[in-house]
């Protein structure tokens, strides 16, 4: 009986120690959770997707997950997809990502982005940690570690606390908040980029003329062949994709991929031959790229349009996150007051307006009408140099007032404290819009506007417009 009790105590002790070790690892492990470096959200978000719910899984490097926007595939075609990849991912790591993906999803096809089709050797430790750390510990991850990582360097990949034991000294607020957060990723692995041209720039026709074919590195070919064999074994289609990057010097490599695709009867879309691109494509150009990919996929497969399927209602919510983010970029690129107002009408944002010096004696009739559609009731064009402020939300007025004197508003909305102050030409010439103690107003002459999105819980836009006599 004594031996039994001792065994139970030892087992309980070991169990508690294991739980403590796991908890410390989760707490201290490096968390890559903010744009443009959000591999942790990307990988853990994949595991949060409902099993066998994805039509397509995209695998590859940052050139893939900054160019393929799952929200656009959903919005345009009703296709469910996910960008399951990590920074600088070579073929030998893509192989293990595909192997891991097929444990959880049974897609119509794996879409392999081939930018890193010519890695001549195993890359450096940093890339290995970025790609391996966030995969779930299990047979696939262990196989990858023992296959890729040299003997003598594997310990911190298996027992991650050995590498990250002192990261508590450098953890930021986002990392702390992520520990207990829902791991669902509404962006479906996509990472927005603001690099390069919003329209992609001018297409380099010289790329389409390149016919040379490189001899790909043996290591890359080996793992591409393993990927092909794996997909055949799992009875899932494999597609090759090259997102546009305008790297004419690498086009012979992408041409060589075409030979591999032809040998194995694998559909291959090389967008370098169709459109301009960058290393990381701008959000708006990524939309164009994704629409082209959607055309390609729907030409190859009959895919159920799930937009009206109530079982996929969450996909509408998730896509909305992306389109709100994209709307932020569009707002911040607008320089005309009327266009800016028009973009805000009908949106469930909180719009804070504070006038500095001049309340809009030269406002056009169109501008006044747009402000009234937004929810403002005053005809601000008659206010001259008076102070004026407004706080409106999708047609609902939280506050609107004007005077020759200083006007101010303070209240809590959505658990945030909003404080708005306007001082017209007779009251000191100042504009202030403070949210949770942080000043966001540009405090320029004219209309100072701050837009808060309660769904994204973020400041969407800050802008100012001086209305002058035309």
Segment roles from a protein language model:
Residues 59, 63-145:
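Membrane-embedded segments
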Residues 88-92, 216-218, 245-252, 360:
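Acidic-and-aromatic substrate-binding clefts and catalytic sites of carbohydrate-active enzymes
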Residues 127-234, 306-327:
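Secreted/periplasmic serine-hydrolase-like ester/acetyl group-modifying domain
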């Amino acid at each position: 009986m004594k031996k039994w009790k001792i065994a139970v105590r030892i087992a309980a002790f070991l169990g508690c120690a294991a739980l403590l070790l796991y908890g410390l690892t989760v707490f201290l492990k490096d968390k890559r959770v903010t744009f443009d470096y959000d591999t942790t959200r990307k990988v853990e978000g994949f595991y949060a997707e409902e099993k066998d719910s994805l039509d397509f899984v995209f695998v590859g490097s940052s050139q893939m997950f900054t160019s393929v926007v799952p929200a656009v595939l959903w919005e345009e075609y009703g296709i469910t997809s996910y960008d399951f990849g990590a920074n600088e991912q070579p073929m030998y790591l893509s192989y293990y990502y595909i192997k891991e993906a097929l444990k959880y999803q049974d897609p119509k096809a794996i879409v392999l982005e081939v930018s890193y089709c010519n890695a001549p050797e195993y890359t450096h430790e940093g890339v290995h940690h970025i790609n391996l750390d966030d995969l779930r510990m299990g047979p696939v991850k262990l196989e990858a570690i023992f296959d890729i990582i040299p003997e003598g360097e594997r310990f911190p990949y298996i027992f991650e606390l050995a590498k990250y034991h002192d990261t508590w000294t450098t953890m930021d607020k986002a990392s702390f908040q992520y520990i207990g957060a829902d791991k669902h990723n509404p962006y479906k692995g996509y990472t927005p980029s603001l690099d390069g041209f919003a329209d992609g720039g001018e297409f380099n026709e010289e790329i389409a003329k390149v016919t040379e074919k490189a001899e790909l590195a043996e290591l890359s070919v080996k793992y591409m062949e393993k990927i092909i064999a794996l997909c055949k074994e799992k009875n899932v289609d494999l597609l090759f994709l090259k997102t546009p990057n305008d790297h004419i010097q690498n086009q012979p490599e992408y041409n060589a991929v075409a030979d591999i695709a032809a040998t194995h009867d694998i559909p291959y879309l090389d967008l370098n031959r169709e459109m301009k691109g960058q290393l990381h494509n701008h959000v708006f150009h990524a939309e164009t790229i994704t629409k082209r990919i959607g055309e390609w996929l729907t030409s190859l497969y009959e895919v159920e349009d799930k937009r009206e399927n109530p079982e996929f209602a969450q996909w509408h919510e998730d896509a909305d996150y992306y389109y709100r983010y994209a709307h932020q970029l569009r707002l911040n690129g607008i320089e005309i007051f009327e266009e800016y107002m028009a973009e805000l009408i009908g949106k469930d944002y909180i719009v804070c307006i504070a006038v500095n010096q001049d309340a809009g004696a030269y406002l056009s009739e169109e501008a006044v009408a747009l402000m009234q559609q937004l929810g403002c009731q005053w005809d601000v064009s008659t206010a001259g140099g008076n102070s004026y402020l407004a706080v409106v939300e999708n047609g609902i007025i939280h506050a609107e007032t004007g005077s020759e004197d200083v006007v101010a508003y303070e209240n809590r909305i959505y658990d945030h404290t909003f404080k708005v102050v306007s001082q017209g030409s007779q009251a000191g010439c100042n504009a202030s819009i403070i949210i949770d103690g942080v000043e966001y107003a540009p405090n320029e002459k004219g209309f100072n506007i701050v837009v808060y999105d309660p769904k994204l819980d973020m400041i969407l836009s800050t802008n100012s417009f001086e209305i002058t006599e035309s």
